[in-house]
Structures are given as structure tokens and as C-alpha cells.
């Protein structure tokens, strides 16, 4: 009787579940560990950059993505699904919002639009749920720094610190012990690296870790000068060398 419902996307089982969403969450749990930490002056998102082969060019792999100059995302689960969501998120931010209002959307608004896209995939014929969970970090003038988790069902929640993927249970336990209300961005980076170190198998260095921050505005990243009113982006990926320098200080 269970199989009768497990392959139906839009039919609830007698226990009140949608089997395909459970399978999508299983795909998330099989993915590498990703985490996010909110600090008083920024947000950190980080993940393991795991290559399927030592012959692969790891520098071309990217699991942390810029959605707007002040919002970034990381995922656990299926990479192709993530890339589709990144493209859709950027389209919403640029075409559906910035082109109309002249500015990028607040973090919560963009998160809700991404969640809507994911939710629609749970009740539409001919598609399947996205096999990915997202951690979206950002800053806006209304809410300051924020961190959200979006699941395949379309549910989303704000977090102080959280983790997704196969090592999420142990990572959350570690974060609960380390996080506090006065945590600053640099300390959050160290905690993120310490947390990932517990779950990463094999080499642990700047080439196998991807980490980004939402911090202060950085005019140097604009690529041009001479327009004082233009603010620099807050999203920035740390280089491999920057990560290695911090690992040496742990």
C-alpha cells in the first residue's frame, strides 16, 4: 500500500506525508555538510568542496553562489537542482524586482520567492521536488544581517546558526555550544571552520573548503571608482589562501 503513494507527487499517504518530498530530504541528507552562522556584524556560509575525482579541476567547482551583491547561498543535495534555483533566484532579484524598484530585494523577500518556486514543484504535474536545501545569507536596510534555511517542501526558517547535509546533526550540536549573541564575524569564521573540520573526510584546506561572508560594504569589489553614491557589495568569497591562513590560526 505504501508504494501506491511513494511515487505519486501530489497524493498524500494515509500518514499525511508526500513521499517524494521525503525522498528529496534524503538527497539533502546524503549531501556534504554546509553551514551558516550569523554574527553581530555579518554572516558566514561555508561548505565542503568535494571533488568526485582527483583529476577534476577543483577550482572550477562552486557551491557558494552570489544571488545579489548583498545576498549569497550555499546548498546540500543535488548540484544541478541548485544551479537551476540560483538562476531563478537571480532572475527574480534582477528582472522582477530591481528593474522595477531600482534596488535589490530584501533578503526575506527573495527567500520567500525562492521558497515559492520550490513549493510549486511539490504540487505540479510532470515535475519533481528540488532535491536540495539552501542556506541563504544576506543583508538589507530593514532587517540587517539574516540567515535562512529553505527546504524542498518550500518551508523556510530564520536561524542564528544551522547546518544541513549528512553531518548536520553533529554540526548543529557543535554550533549550539559555540554560538552566542556577541559573536563577531571573524570568530564566526573560525567556528565555521572548526565545525566543518569535524565532518570533512580527507584533506582539510583552502582547496577543499568554500567559505563566503556577508560583511561590510566593500567598494574595492565594484571594479570602478569615482561614483561616491555607489556602495560596494557585502558578499565576498574568501580565497584559498585566506582560508589556509585562518586554519593555521585555529
UniProtKB/Swiss-Prot annotation:
Record keywords: Cytoplasm, Isopeptide bond, Nucleus, Proteasome, Ubl conjugation
Domain of life, source organism: Eukaryota
Cellular-component GO terms for this entry: nucleus; proteasome complex; proteasome core complex, alpha-subunit complex; proteasome storage granule
SMART domains (alphabetical): Proteasome_A_N
CDD domains to which the protein is assigned, alphabetical: proteasome_alpha_type_2
Glycyl lysine isopeptide (Lys-Gly) (interchain with G-Cter in ubiquitin) cross-link, renumbered residues: 108
Subcellular localization, as worded in the UniProt entry: Cytoplasm; Nucleus
Listed GO biological process terms: proteasomal ubiquitin-independent protein catabolic process; proteasome-mediated ubiquitin-dependent protein catabolic process
Quaternary structure, from the entry: The 26S proteasome consists of a 20S proteasome core and two 19S regulatory subunits. The 20S proteasome core is composed of 28 subunits that are arranged in four stacked rings, resulting in a barrel-shaped structure. The two end rings are each formed by seven alpha subunits, and the two central rings are each formed by seven beta subunits. The catalytic chamber with the active sites is on the inside of the barrel.
Something else known: Present with 7060 molecules/cell in log phase SD medium.
Family classification: Belongs to the peptidase T1A family.
Record protein name field: Proteasome subunit alpha type-2
Gene: PRE8
